């Protein structure tokens, strides 16, 4: 068990955690357990990233860039990649994210899950 919290730190709850190393592992854990949620940077407002009574799949190790088409500006990455890493990687290549939240310490998966800036 590990205590996890969200950005507001209003709740600090015990979770059964599993560290992910690939997507197949996540599918197996969800199929063989009760409800689960992916947890990365813990910057969600409210408690959207928490799952007391279920499992938390920590995806910070899923932090690889898979491809970049520099001509089209299309990047494929794993869900644990942070916006900080993306900015450090893309800006020297002449690319920027079209929108950014108030922090760079969020994961791509968290941005998608929370619909950050549409």
Predicted feature locations:
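Glycine-rich N-terminal segment of FAD-binding domains in flavoprotein oxidoreductases
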Residues: 8-105, 114-117
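N-terminal regions that are enriched for targeting/export leaders
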Residues: 1-6
């Amino acid at each position: 068990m590990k205590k996890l919290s969200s950005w507001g730190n209003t709740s600090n709850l015990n979770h059964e955690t599993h560290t992910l190393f690939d997507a197949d592992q996540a599918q197996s854990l969800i199929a063989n357990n009760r409800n689960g949620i992916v947890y990365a940077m813990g910057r969600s407002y409210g408690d959207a990233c928490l799952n007391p009574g279920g499992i938390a799949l920590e995806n910070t190790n899923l932090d690889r860039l898979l491809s970049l088409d520099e001509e089209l500006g299309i990047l494929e990455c794993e869900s644990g990649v942070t916006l900080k890493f993306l900015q450090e990687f893309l800006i020297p290549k002449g690319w920027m994210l079209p929108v950014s939240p108030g922090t760079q310490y969020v994961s791509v998966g968290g941005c998608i899950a929370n619909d950050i800036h549409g």
